[in-house]
């Protein structure tokens, strides 16, 4: 059987060790004779899953004690609404950094609840898209918070700086970059992330929120999106997505076994450098992102002859290189190389790219 490597942007590849363990435990979890999917979320057995997964996540990200960790429903799109409704308070304005598709999507949702001050930080130089340094961002004085997206999956644009905005409340959509490298949680008021890229399967959403920001929700906010309600109920205000939570917990343990986020950073940098090196080697492939803002997680690329895209994708699929088609908004190709993607998968892709260029270049 051909070795398959899944380059999907999300739901994305999971570590094979995690899948094997889940397979082994699927029908008889911890000797209970049932699956973890079938037990009560309030049982002592699942409470152990919840407690261990939070502890492991806190260890990985070095989350300070004055932050709550919430395991939620709804994906990042639910957080596009939850953030303003939890954080605006008496204000009607928030700063939104527009650096790409998902940042702009957050703006559109926020417009239902406030008047966002939208700050376009993109640059376009010699056909390459980049991001202004944070010190050039023109933040307003009275915004309730500053929202940005550190990694744009569609455009392959990353903001690698850590924010240093004084006392401003910083909110970040880390859906596609969480756990890929160490970050300083204390610089943020809220971090949220859909699980289906670098955490686990779809259905779970992670929120990390500083405690002093709780209790400010709009009165019309649905309870299921209220950070204080979720925190007071240990993320069990209603039945959580237990299987996704369990699998994410296994991923956290896998990350610790691999050496933590420092090791992930080294691996992810090596994978990205290998792939971008293959793209830049000749003019056959192109990436249109400024080098300083190239994503380690999502690598879009095009060919000089777009008519070859369909052939490239079909031949890649035949060789076990799956889900390389670019997003419908951007076209071309895109390789998502999250934590679970081994460097062997990236090497298989770059070898195929070189062979395809030799035959069609």
Curated annotation (Swiss-Prot):
Locations listed in the record? Cytoplasm
Cofactor(s) demanded = pyridoxal 5'-phosphate
Name the pathway it acts in: Amino-acid biosynthesis; L-serine biosynthesis; L-serine from 3-phospho-D-glycerate: step 2/3; Cofactor biosynthesis; pyridoxine 5'-phosphate biosynthesis; pyridoxine 5'-phosphate from D-erythrose 4-phosphate: step 3/5
Database matches in InterPro entries: Aminotrans_V_dom (IPR000192), Aminotrans_V_PyrdxlP_BS (IPR020578), Pser_aminoTfrase (IPR022278), PyrdxlP-dep_Trfase (IPR015424), PyrdxlP-dep_Trfase_major (IPR015421), PyrdxlP-dep_Trfase_small (IPR015422)
**Where mainly found?**
cytoplasm
Identify the SUPFAM superfamilies for this entry: PLP-dependent transferases
Tell me the leader sequence span.
none
Coiled-coil positions are: none
Q: Where does L-glutamate bind?
A: 42
Q: Which UniProt keywords apply?
A: Amino-acid biosynthesis, Aminotransferase, Cytoplasm, Pyridoxal phosphate, Pyridoxine biosynthesis, Serine biosynthesis, Transferase
Catalytic activity, EC: 2.6.1.52
- Catalytic reactions on record: O-phospho-L-serine + 2-oxoglutarate = 3-phosphooxypyruvate + L-glutamate; 4-(phosphooxy)-L-threonine + 2-oxoglutarate = (R)-3-hydroxy-2-oxo-4-phosphooxybutanoate + L-glutamate
What sort of enzyme, by top EC class, is this? transferase
Pfam families the UniProt entry points to: Aminotran_5
The Gene Ontology biological process annotation of the record reads: L-serine biosynthetic process; pyridoxine biosynthetic process
Q: Which GO terms describe its molecular function?
A: O-phospho-L-serine:2-oxoglutarate aminotransferase activity; pyridoxal phosphate binding
Listed PANTHER family? PHOSPHOSERINE AMINOTRANSFERASE
NCBIfam families, alphabetically? PRK05355.1 (NF003764), serC_1 (TIGR01364)
Cited HAMAP family: SerC_aminotrans_5
> Under what name is this protein listed?
Phosphoserine aminotransferase
Q: Which organism is it from?
A: Yersinia pseudotuberculosis serotype IB (strain PB1/+)
Point out the gene that encodes the protein: serC
